[in-house]
Amino acid sequence: MSSAPASGSVRARYLVYFQYVGTDFNGVAAVRGTQRAVGVQNYLEEAAERLNSVEPVRFTISSRTDAGVHALSNAAHLDVQRRSGRPPFPPEVLAEALNTHLRHPAIRVLRAFRVPSDFHARHAATSRTYLYRLATGCHRRDELPVFERNLCWTLPADCLDMVAMQEAAQHLLGTHDFSAFQSAGSPVPSPVRTLRRVSVSPGQASPLVTPEESRKLRFWNLEFESQSFLYRQVRRMTAVLVAVGLGALAPAQVKTILESQDPLGKHQTRVAPAHGLFLKSVLYGNLGAASCTLQGPQFGSHG
């Protein structure tokens, strides 16, 4: 579970789950140097400085999210070596200490666990699930309730053809070369991914939104599960499925796009905005019940 450096103190590795509203951040990854933009990781590592570790604490993030993307539950591992031979922090104490010293109210550490010294938060993940939220019937931005702004993609259409979207989604299931849904020029060893689950279902407004405010709006949830995704793959798949829901594409055309394996095709102009996307969960098969899956009630589905 740990290594014993020459100083006599113990270096302990932890897995931490954390959540954030991504609106104010330049993504989850730390921004180094003199840039004014700041990532979620910058704040986490700043809080970790107060742990007084022998070595600077660095977070290795499981799943990188872009600017404006949110996380109900992301994960990272970190090593902490206390001074003067003190024993490692209990996980719950570590989580509480990080939250105490976090300087941004849109970030919160959820839980922490001790893990083996060779555990890797990114490589060990067995499942990642993303949620994308849509709101239809919103013809102007000022029609969207305050407590839904920057938390969903608004569409002026009154409704989506959910049956057609569900039919189109079936073409994406399974193991495929997803080159057509990755950003052109994104270097990856292989564009092949296995999409284990994709769902399209009615959603609901935040419980902070009054019935009168949401009377003309309809909410929709898209969920995607895989061990890993290509850069912006989820946002591009979402945009294509929305095009099907609006009648701009037929369900069969999604299969054609997928099989084209063309990252420069006309469909590449379709990218869903970042603010509707949430990293919902990151799971680790070897941790069993330790994996932390959270879903706020405002993001649930009916039925």
UniProtKB/Swiss-Prot annotation:
<keyword id="KW-0597">Phosphoprotein</keyword>
<dbReference type="GO" id="GO:0106029">
    <property type="term" value="F:tRNA pseudouridine synthase activity"/>
</dbReference>
<dbReference type="GO" id="GO:0003723">
    <property type="term" value="F:RNA binding"/>
</dbReference>
<keyword id="KW-0819">tRNA processing</keyword>
<keyword id="KW-0413">Isomerase</keyword>
<feature type="binding site">
    <location>
        <position position="130"/>
    </location>
    <ligand>
        <name>substrate</name>
    </ligand>
</feature>
<dbReference type="InterPro" id="IPR020095">
    <property type="entry name" value="PsdUridine_synth_TruA_C"/>
</dbReference>
<dbReference type="InterPro" id="IPR020103">
    <property type="entry name" value="PsdUridine_synth_cat_dom_sf"/>
</dbReference>
<feature type="active site" description="Nucleophile">
    <location>
        <position position="66"/>
    </location>
</feature>
<dbReference type="InterPro" id="IPR020097">
    <property type="entry name" value="PsdUridine_synth_TruA_a/b_dom"/>
</dbReference>
<dbReference type="InterPro" id="IPR020094">
    <property type="entry name" value="TruA/RsuA/RluB/E/F_N"/>
</dbReference>
<feature type="modified residue" description="Phosphoserine">
    <location>
        <position position="84"/>
    </location>
</feature>
<dbReference type="Pfam" id="PF01416">
    <property type="entry name" value="PseudoU_synth_1"/>
</dbReference>
<dbReference type="GO" id="GO:0005739">
    <property type="term" value="C:mitochondrion"/>
</dbReference>
<protein>
    <recommendedName>
        <fullName>tRNA pseudouridine synthase-like 1</fullName>
        <ecNumber>5.4.99.-</ecNumber>
    </recommendedName>
</protein>
<dbReference type="InterPro" id="IPR001406">
    <property type="entry name" value="PsdUridine_synth_TruA"/>
</dbReference>
<comment type="similarity">
    <text>Belongs to the tRNA pseudouridine synthase TruA family.</text>
</comment>
<dbReference type="GO" id="GO:0031119">
    <property type="term" value="P:tRNA pseudouridine synthesis"/>
</dbReference>
<dbReference type="GO" id="GO:0009982">
    <property type="term" value="F:pseudouridine synthase activity"/>
</dbReference>
<dbReference type="GO" id="GO:0043231">
    <property type="term" value="C:intracellular membrane-bounded organelle"/>
</dbReference>
